[in-house]
Amino acid sequence: MEVVQYIHRLNMTEAGLSGTKALFLRIQKDAIPSVVKFWGINALRLDTNYPIVFEDQASAKKYTMVLRKFSKNAKELRINSIVDYLRDKNIETGDEIIFTRISKISGKYEYYISMKKNLCTQFCYVKPKKLYVILHKEHTSLTSDNGKLVVTSNGKEISLSYEFVGKDTLRDAASKIVGDSTAKALSFNLYKVLLGNDSPNNNMSLKVSNGKYILIEEKRWEISEINN
């Protein structure tokens, strides 16, 4: 028996917190070679919807999801019809969705789905030119609406300018993520110093340890194989 897992960490859009109503999981083109191996089909040539039935490992409830190629040029895959699962599980930004495929001796596949809650102290997400951080009020020592914050990234301390974000959409997202209506969204203007590229596919988590802010980059997806 062969067990293969595809682990996908949710960003703002996928968790339904970015203002969009279309809930789906986007699989970036750089992940496609591994995803082809996981789904067991030639996804690069997928021209129609490919339905797959997943059984929730916690409740045994079955969910039918659809793998679909969204753009031939971008070679982007989407997992559609996942909204029921996301809502049933009260999914939040940073949570992990774990898709598991089990190969039977008969050659058939069985698919399962499960989730793992995000236990990060803070959560970051990226938009063009900005790095936004959702802050728990009890974990921030920032007393002014703008200033400097020393952040540790890859073992290096970097002083960054910050400001609190006043947009209603970001304030709403902050309150949903941490469950606190007084939560604030913080923005850094110099995220390139930390990330080094314009369109990172990974999630960022800002953790607090002994009063220090530590920025950790986490992969948005990964494939793992367990052969029995």
Regions found by a protein language model. Name each.
Residues 1-228:
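Acidic, low-complexity intrinsically disordered regions
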